[in-house]
C-alpha cells in the first residue's frame, strides 16, 4: 500500500511539474480577431448595428488557429469577458483546448486584449492604467498592457500584449492619431523597461497590433530607448514570401502592423528562419488581420 501511494504521489507531482514548466518548443502567436464583440457591420450585404461576429467568420477563425496550433495566443479586439468565454468554449469544441485565459479591460470599453494558453500562467499582471501626457493632459494607454509570465526550462518568459491606438482621427491637430499612438508606444516601452531594466539579460516578448509600420515612431520606440536595445522584430513572412498582416479592404491597402518583438535575452531562442505570417485557408474570412507566429526553441542549455 505504501509503495502504491508513493508511486501515485510521484505521478501526481510529475504531472504537476509537466503542466507548469514549458520545455523544448513554445509556439507563440498574435492575432487581431477583428471585432469579436458587438459592432456595427455588414452581414450578407445588410448593415447591422451592435451585431456579434458572424458564425462564418468565427468558424474561419477557429480553422486558422487550428492550423497554427499555438501554445500561447495573444488576441486583440476581443469583447468583454462573455465574448472571451464564448471564444474559449468554441475553440475547445473544435478540439483546440486553451484552459488558461485572461482578459484585460482598460479605457476602451469595447475592445480588449487577451491571452489564451495551453500552459498555465505563472503570473498575470493587468496594466490597465499606463499613464501618458497628451496635449498637456493626463491620459492612459487606451487598451492597457496585459502581461503574463510563463515558466520554462530556460527560466521565465514574459509576454506583453498591446493594441495601440488606431489611425482613426479624433483630433484635427493629431491627424490619424499619430501622436497619441506614438505616446502610447513610448509609455508601453517605459513600462517594459521598468519591469526589465536590462533587456539584454531578460526574456520577454512584446506582441500585438501596433497600428503602424516598422519604420514609424511607435515601432522604433518599442525597439530602443537611447542606447538601450529593448528588442528586435521577429522576421515573418507567408508561404509566398509576403510580410503584410493587415488589409484595409475599402482601399485595397496591405501593410505589416502586427508584430512579435523579442528581447535580446530571448533572441537566441528564435529560429534562423524567423516566424510565419499565416496565409492558409480561412484567413481572409476570419479577420482583416493575419496572425503572426514564432516557435521558440527553449531546449535547456547543457
Where are these regions (language model features)?
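Metal-dependent phosphoester-hydrolase catalytic domains
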Residues: 140, 190-205, 211-302
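Catalytic metal-binding/acid-base residues of hydrolase active sites
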Residues: 34, 78-79, 163-165, 210-213
